[in-house]
């Protein structure tokens, strides 16, 4: 297992950037929407985009239970398959942050059921892979990780997650190719270089691995400094 929920994998929902998360309280800023009484509001009166925004804001301030509720509500009212799939994917990610793997699996499968070949299919597959991996379903996780990059070859976190699983499975040559793809597509975090070092070590390319691991260490230190500065 992993010591932290997202160690190894990268499964961030899209567009979770808020300049000052501590200053945002979705309950205050979206009170009418968030306190919606489902029994008294017709579906065509619900702003699904706004509900998605509520969930994203909750995610940004680590209120994942509230985020999951907002995303579920958005999914229930969405009349567009793409919006509904987005809501289910984000709900699954929120459950993943809470380490609620069964709920995460269900949400991502629902996203694929709604729109199996749509815009969010690759994200659903790669997030489903993570949740299944955490449940110990290694083979299913690997299959969905492959499906993610098959659906969207330009999804950097999809390549990273597949590479991570391949390192764990001892498929070091394939893993190296996936991790290099992730880097080329802009995935610039210490974790991808750490996994690349592991893949190189598995291929007995130890000198290269040491150089890559040094890069990973430098990036990790920079990430930690940015985290401290943001607090």
List each language-model region with its residue ranges.
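Structural marker of alpha-solenoid helical repeat scaffolds
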Residues: 77-80, 114-117, 151, 185, ...
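TPR-adjacent "capping" and linker segments in tetratricopeptide-repeat scaffold/adaptor proteins
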Residues: 32-50, 78-81, 115-119
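Canonical positions in the second alpha-helix
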Residues: 74, 110-111, 147-148, 181-182, ...
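Conserved alpha-helical positions within TPR/SEL1-like repeat arrays
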Residues: 52-60, 85-97, 120-133, 157-164, ...
């Amino acid at each position: 297992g992993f010591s932290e929920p997202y160690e190894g994998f990268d499964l961030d929902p899209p567009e979770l950037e808020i300049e000052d998360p501590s200053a945002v309280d979705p309950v205050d800023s979206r009170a009418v929407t968030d306190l919606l009484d489902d029994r008294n509001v017709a579906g065509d009166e619900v702003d699904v985009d706004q509900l998605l925004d509520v969930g994203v804001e909750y995610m940004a301030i680590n209120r994942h239970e509230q985020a999951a509720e907002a995303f579920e509500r958005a999914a229930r009212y969405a009349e567009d398959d793409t919006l509904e799939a987005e809501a289910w994917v984000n709900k699954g990610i929120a459950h993943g942050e809470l380490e609620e793997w069964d709920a995460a699996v269900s949400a991502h499968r629902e996203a694929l059921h709604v729109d199996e070949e749509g815009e969010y299919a690759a994200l659903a597959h790669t997030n489903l892979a993570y949740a299944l991996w955490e449940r110990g379903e290694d083979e299913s996780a690997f299959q969905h990780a492959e499906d993610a990059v098959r659906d969207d070859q330009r999804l950097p976190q999809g390549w990273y997650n597949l590479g991570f699983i391949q390192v764990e499975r001892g498929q070091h040559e394939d893993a190296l190719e996936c991790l290099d793809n992730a880097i080329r597509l802009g995935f610039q975090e210490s974790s991808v270089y750490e996994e690349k070092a592991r893949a190189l070590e598995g291929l007995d390319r130890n000198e290269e691995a040491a150089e890559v691991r040094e890069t990973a260490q430098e990036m990790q230190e920079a990430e930690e400094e940015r985290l401290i500065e943001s607090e």
